[in-house]
Amino acid sequence: MITLPLLLLSALNSLDIQIVSRTENSIQLKIPFADKILEPVNIGFIISPEYPVYECLETGSNNPVEIGPPVTLKDYNLYPVILNPVAGIKEFNLEIHFSKYQDIKLPHSLAQVFKNLILNYEYNPETKPQGLLIITPNSFYNAVLPLADWKEKKGWKVTVARLSETGASATAIKNYITNAYYNWNPPPEYVILVGDKDSVPCFTVSSNPTDHPYTTIKGNDFLSDLFIGRLSVANVNDLNTVIAKIINYERNPYTTDTLWFKRTLMVAGNYPDNQMTTPIPTKRWVREKFLNSGYYQVDTVFYPPVSNGVTAVTNSVNQGVTFVNYRGGIASWSGWDRPSFYNTDVIGLSNNWKLPVVTSIVCLTGNFNAEPCFGETWLRAGNPSNPKGAIAFFGASPPTTHSRWNNCLDFGIYHGLLIDSIYYLGPMTYRGKMEVYVNFPLETSPDSGSEFYFNAYNLLGDPSLEVWTDVPRNFIVNHQPTIPVGTNQFSVQVLNSSSQPVKGAMVSLYKKNETKEVGFTDANGIANFQITTNTPDTLFVTVTKHNFKPYCGYAMVNNSAVYVGYYNHTISDAGGNNNGEINPGETINLTITLKNFGNSTTATNVSAKLTTDDPFITVVDSIKDYGTITPGATANSSPFVFNVSQNIKNNHTIKFNISVSSSQCNWNSALRLNAKAAEFDYQRCYILDGGNGILEPGETSDLTISIKNVGGLIGTNLQGVLRSLNPGVSVIDS
């Protein structure tokens, strides 16, 4: 069977699949179908990752196309559409009819994974990162805070929860995560467990340790609703090492030697005596993809001929590589069998800050039930000032896995990285798991099918880590170095090293307990913010973008003798519907309260002017007098007045500028208000032809269309016009 990109449908949707035309012809398969063969038992033929379909079993049906059983993803059902290669169809046209339109909304983390797997989904690349939940034993709490602080400054909404808050059992922790998922704003998209399984428990599935069940919140299936990783450490010293690795990898990457950013290492072990020959072809495929993506050096250590891999692997890792990708057939919890490389060899590395991501697609090496397993050794190696080993490790805990699933998993991880441009570690490795599901949607057994592999492979590391795929570039960032208390607007300009604007850079402003704003730069490299600065302190400014070294700066918020600015406002729409909101066609009375945030000087002869360049707003009464405002005091005036266009859209943001003048100085404040309007989405249509509900050639039918008001205002006196864009269809009554 061939699985198309997945279809994403809500639980209320229905769909119809129709073969419009087809040419029936026998197809000569290049290689036979693979059986479920356990590594390292004889397979008998080579499977190229270019043809994953041939690793799949036929559906057992003569139907050329089928819909597989759904699984749940967030608020939607996910259906695989399966084409059966043994049905004898060489060419076909496939039409998929949706009886209900769905505006699909996925958080940034899941959107990365599914953007090229779902037919009816349009990816929005600037969705902001959301929640990060760190769960830690009480004894590790203080050691975790530097990581939480860095992530917070980057723009994440970080919560650090002690086991004394979550509960100490796996069930209690899962319940805590579930509650956060449903009730927090924003909900966590990433979860970091801090400690080995003796510190933070895991689940056991098919007798193997796994963290995957923590991620399955919605539905009765095995798909993740969020991403998880474990900093599997045994003590505070190990934890300090791992956190130092993560922070420095993201914030201050090693650039004394930049060649390591474009080097990787492929390690594979075939077993020709058992005719297990797929690992090396799989690694050659991944190697080719790296080279095609601009990597100039992709080392290989293959068995045969290399049996003892210590020297070759050590030399490559010490030179510096960004990824180490192993695919083999025999391993143990302490390392790879062929080419051999074990825990003691990891300890002997000296790669310092040139830390790779290790993906170990083989049995046992990620079994964190052992102490320490191979993956834990890579993660913990070194110390905070002289690290070595890896930044993260992705591997399996069970003692047995199968080649045809492992090959798909390996392929999917690096397809996600190199083709789909998935750079966050949790989504990148989960893309590998989804490749397993895409190729085996009908084989989902928890003991041997897709579900088994979702549980089998776990991430030892930070799932929110953004990996490097090129030599880091540098920003030039411009912003005010100091601002007075009371300032409520702040602009950041982001340029590259050639002084050209950088579009799409994420800018985070963070002032403890007061300001947390995240935005993206526009085509001019500018990000504008409305902020709160009621007290003196440091406003941290952090700018990030993939393959740019983060800018970590700040502006000092200082007291001033006198500073008058926006404090609060009230809206009156008594001449409209009197709901206290800005709606189409209304006249708004806007009362703005100003405050003197200064600490010593009275502001006199204060006046303010309200302006906007918004095409939907006309300010008709724009200038107001406020008189005298003493330090720390507030003052009101009569309302400003503006008219709202009938054509304003729902959730449209109106940007006002408040120019304040006085005998002492002039200032500017920002004010942003949202409008509410009716907004209608197409939902579904019904073809009332008295027959099969399908509009067919020569047929005249009634058409009923259902719409939904997804806006913030009741819609009244609605009218609709129907037009046909198909020359073969005429609308009689429009």
Task: Tell me the role of every PLM-derived stretch.
Residues G486-F490, P584-T591, A635-S638, H652-K655, ...:
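Short, solvent-exposed loop/turn segments enriched in Ser/Thr/Gly
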Residues S491-S497, T591-K595, T704-K708:
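Short edge beta-strand/loop segments characteristic of extracellular beta-sandwich folds
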Residues G519, N524-N528, T618-I648, S730-S734:
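Intrinsically disordered, low-complexity Pro/Gly/Ser/Thr-rich segments with frequent PxxP/GP/PP motifs
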Residues M506-K512, K595-I617, K708-I732:
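Short acidic, flexible loop segments centered on an aromatic residue
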Residues A11-Y551:
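Cysteine-dependent hydrolase recognition
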Residues V543-M556, V641-E679:
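Terminal connector regions
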Residues I2-S10:
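Sec-dependent N-terminal signal peptides
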Residues P472-Q480, N559-P584, R672-G698:
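Low-complexity, acidic Ser/Thr/Pro/Gly-rich terminal tails and inter-domain linkers that flank the onset
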